[in-house]
Amino acid sequence: MLFADVVRTSEAVRATRSRKTKVAALAELLRAAESAELAPVVAWLSGELRQGRIGTGWRTLTGVRVPPALDAALEVATVDAIFDELAAVSGAGSGNRRKELLTRLWSAATEPEQEFLLRLLTGELRQGALTALVAEAVAAAADVPVEQVRRAYMLSGQLPVTAEAALRGGAAALAEFRLEVGRPIQPMLAAPGASLEEAMTEFGGEVSVEHKLDGARIQVHRDGDRIAVFTRTLRDITAGVPELVELVARLDCTSVVLDGETLALTDAGRPRPFQETMSRFATADPARAAEVDLPPGTPVVPPVSSTRELLLHPYFFDCLHLDGRDLLDAPLSERRAALLAVVGEHAIPALIRPEPEAAAEYFDGALAAGHEGLMVKSLSAPYAAGRRGRSWQKIKPTHTLDLLVLGAEWGYGRRTGYLSNLHLGARDPRTGEPVMVGKTFKGLTDALLAWQTAEFPRHERARDEHTVYLWPELVVEIALDGVQVSPRYPGGVALRFARVVRYRPDKTPDQADTIDTVRGLLP
């Protein structure tokens, strides 16, 4: 298959708002791909690389200035092979070797192919063909139910692997996917709850009420002496968090998969700012730290060996596997019992089936301790990997949403010369496209204004005199007092008193909240 076929399909997907048309175009391309081409093609269409990170940052890529090829002759296999070579480069002279490989690739690429490669390698390839959309295309190409593809993907954590199985072996191959210790799965996500009282009533009081920590999500796998720690986005950070590895090694079990959060604490035992915890994740992967321009407030700090105060403390809230037994489909009550049996004091504090008054006091106590609020979880619900559902609800003193930045307006007054007023959007789960729900410049510090002005042009899709419009690639956490019906925006709702809390570099665009979630906050 020619690389140009992938580029043309990507452009066609970007050019239409019809989800049906997007899926059809992607499925047609997948059917045409050879077996060995499926993994890279699926990865690229999802805006990723089969090899993961390959050490090519923005400065390296923009330094490659080669005239484009006139004819489209590059093949998918050739591009993927060069990515393999780039991923293997290390040691002395690695910078020059990467430049040689990139120059070879760029020389063989046409202008549209060069543009695609630049956006792919800088993580800016967002075309509406996010993983959920590509998963639908895989199902269509393989003629299997999309739910089977989604479940297999949740368990494999890798859509290219899932696609290969679907197109080679159909439904039977997808049914073979199981939770595998050592292979991360997509984490279960929570939906915003209207209030503590309503969340408890919805589940008839059969709930676990837990502290909602302002930490970083982790998933820990142990199989005998082999231990791995993964982030929310399934990135392996094992080498950078030795204190977590040592703790898990001491647990009284043979095999276990744990879900939880980790955070840095002050000497008084209070949580440090989220950005400080995230800085440890950056140092857990120096290559990643070099490639990613993190928002202000996310400093790259020395590793734990030289910064004792930034030791990470884990708090586990779910057990997905224990000593040979998978627990994904077990109710939370059963998973919680297994969790307490294996991690003991390292389980997150919780009240089980509390009275409303006790839950309210617990809420106040969580806030006083410096936490974000509470999680209310149904004790009867299974672990819905990769999904954001009502069986987990997050309760905060003010509502927060994770939204996509769709654009920014040039500021005036003290903000003159800076990209300021943000255009905010939620995901439409039916089309995969963002839906604008409001604007805000509230909460933007001088440092964030400067960062936005430098960073946003990397994500630019268009501009006019007043506004720079962005591809929906950046996730920002927004606090709000509520939502209201509004004919001004296409989704029919608008945010009330929205303000920026922080950017979320730990979240991908398909983990942003949906327009349905926003509408669910209507009074």
From Swiss-Prot:
One BP term from GO: cell division
Reactions the enzyme catalyzes: ATP + (deoxyribonucleotide)n-3'-hydroxyl + 5'-phospho-(deoxyribonucleotide)m = (deoxyribonucleotide)n+m + AMP + diphosphate
Coiled-coil portions: none
Residues forming the catalytic site: 212 (n6-amp-lysine intermediate)
CDD domains, per database record: Adenylation_DNA_ligase_Arch_LigB
Xref: InterPro entries: ATP-dep_DNA_ligase, DNA_ligae_ATP-dep_bac/arc, DNA_ligase_ATP-dep, DNA_ligase_ATP-dep_C, DNA_ligase_ATP-dep_cent, DNA_ligase_ATP-dep_CS, DNA_ligase_ATP-dep_N, DNA_ligase_N_sf
Gene: lig
Family to which the UniProt record says this protein belongs: Belongs to the ATP-dependent DNA ligase family.
Organism phylogeny: Bacteria, Bacillati, Actinomycetota, Actinomycetes, Mycobacteriales
SUPFAM superfamilies for this protein: ATP-dependent DNA ligase DNA-binding domain, DNA ligase/mRNA capping enzyme, catalytic domain, Nucleic acid-binding proteins
Matching Gene3D superfamilies: DNA ligase, ATP-dependent, N-terminal domain, DNA ligase/mRNA capping enzyme, Nucleic acid-binding proteins
Keywords: ATP-binding, Cell cycle, Cell division, DNA damage, DNA recombination, DNA repair, DNA replication, Ligase, Magnesium, Metal-binding, Nucleotide-binding
Domain of life, source organism: Bacteria
Glycosyltransferase as UniProt keyword: no
Keyword Metal-binding: yes
Function as written in the Swiss-Prot or TrEMBL entry: DNA ligase that seals nicks in double-stranded DNA during DNA replication, DNA recombination and DNA repair.
One MF term in the entry's GO annotations: DNA binding
Amino acids binding ATP: 210, 217, 232, 261, 317, 388, 394
EC number: 6.5.1.1
Protein name: Probable DNA ligase
PANTHER family, per the entry: DNA LIGASE 1/3 FAMILY MEMBER, DNA LIGASE-RELATED
Listed cofactors: Mg(2+)
